[in-house]
């Protein structure tokens, strides 16, 4: 299908094709040279060089990596924030493509190279095309989306949300067909919380379990009872919540009941109410196991980014702009949610926000996110660029009223 811009941007069509080819090349360059969270020094240099090639020289860099550029069209007007995350993952790239990662053990396996390229492409298009927007525009290249603690709070501390009316973000998704865009209101990403537990007991001989506390058996009880809380006490339609235990370790010997056992799990949810309710019930289970079996259980939780909640009015405005200005050019769905986390949730906590999903699925066995064969087709870059360049000229502060 031939894609076009809204009538107001028709004169930009030919220029866009030239910019698009450069953005695709830039994405491949980023993919070849991935860097881990908080180490994106060369990535930041590459972003700055790309922007400078389009005459964008004022780059705000309050931290060692990442930063943002501002486009001021009207003094005193608020900003629209467009976020692109820039970090990669500690995964060996196993793909056979010309732009395969050249950094051993590091790969853009979550599509952040695409996000960065699209964000940079929007900035380049606005600059080169002389596009004027009703609100000011801030394009953020954010480091360290992946780890705990994540990069979004650092950017917020540095002032990236100053005078921002609302924020837009994106994420490629291999479960959504290429060319499809998800504009889903409400929660779209869960909060991820790491649960670390250390069981300590007297230990003993495996032939006399009645004389000691069997930590492996007690850990299995905790796992079963915890799953019971999640799947029998929570109405998933009201409180989406997931719990998965992923690691258990007790290295003593085949005939030794261990003195120490480590258990790790992941809790995912979308609301503070559900989180507090789970913590209360979970701590009660721990106390019961401790008192009944004369053991000690140390519980440490590491909370990741808050859940991402898309502002319903902003989502509706984006849908209406697309339907009005470029009907039939984008296939839009409105009911796609992910149990994964994203630190875009920190922005969504403070300003009305929308995290847009860009489909990249081209076959049934599409490699998933965070895998060594993950890749995104170059066509998604055009979809992302056209989407943001279509909606930004029509986004007004009034959409939230």
Predicted features by range, described:
Residues 2-108, 113, 117-133:
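Acidic/His- and Gly-rich active-site-bordering loop/insert found
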Residues 35, 85-87, 144-146, 173, ...:
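Active-site beta-loop-alpha junctions enriched in small/polar residues
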Residues 78-81, 137-138, 165-168, 243, ...:
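Structural motif
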Residues 33, 210-217, 273-278:
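Active-site pocket-shaping loop/turn-to-helix segments
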């Amino acid at each position: 299908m031939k894609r076009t811009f809204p009538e107001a941007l028709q004169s930009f069509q030919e220029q866009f094709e030239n910019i698009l080819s450069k953005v695709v090349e830039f994405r491949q360059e980023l993919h070849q040279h991935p860097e881990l969270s908080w180490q994106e020094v060369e990535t930041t240099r590459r972003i700055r060089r790309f922007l400078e090639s389009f005459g964008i020289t004022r780059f705000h860099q309050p931290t060692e990596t990442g930063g943002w550029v501002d486009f001021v069209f009207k003094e005193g007007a608020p900003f629209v924030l467009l976020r692109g995350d820039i970090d990669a993952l500690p995964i060996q790239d196993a793909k056979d493509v010309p732009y395969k990662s050249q950094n051993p053990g590091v790969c853009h396996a979550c599509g952040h190279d695409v996000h960065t390229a699209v964000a940079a492409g929007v900035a380049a298009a606005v600059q080169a095309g002389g596009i004027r927007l009703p609100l000011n525009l801030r394009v953020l290249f954010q480091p360290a989306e992946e780890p705990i603690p994540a990069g979004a709070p650092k950017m917020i501390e540095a002032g990236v949300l100053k005078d921002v009316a609302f924020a837009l973000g994106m994420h490629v998704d291999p479960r959504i067909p290429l060319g499809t865009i998800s504009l889903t209101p409400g929660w779209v990403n869960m909060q991820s919380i790491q649960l670390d537990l250390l069981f300590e007991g007297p230990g003993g001989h495996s032939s006399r379990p009645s004389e000691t506390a069997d930590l492996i058996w007690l850990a299995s009880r905790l796992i079963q009872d915890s799953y019971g809380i999640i799947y029998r006490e929570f109405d998933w339609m009201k409180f989406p919540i997931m719990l998965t235990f992923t690691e258990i370790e007790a290295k003593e010997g085949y005939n030794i009941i261990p003195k120490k056992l480590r258990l790790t799990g992941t809790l995912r949810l979308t609301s503070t109410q559900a989180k507090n309710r789970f913590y209360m019930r979970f701590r009660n289970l721990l106390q019961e196991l401790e008192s009944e079996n004369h053991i000690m259980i140390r519980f440490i939780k590491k909370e990741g980014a808050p859940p991402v909640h898309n502002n319903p009015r902003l989502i509706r405005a984006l849908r209406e702009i697309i339907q009005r200005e470029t009907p039939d050019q984008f296939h839009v769905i409105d009911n796609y949610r992910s149990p994964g986390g994203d630190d875009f949730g920190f922005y969504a906590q403070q300003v009305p926000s929308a995290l847009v999903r860009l489909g990249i699925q081209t076959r049934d066995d599409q490699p998933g996110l965070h895998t060594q064969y993950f890749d995104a087709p170059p066509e998604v870059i055009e979809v992302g660029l056209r989407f943001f360049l279509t909606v930004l000229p029509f986004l007004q502060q009034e959409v939230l009223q």
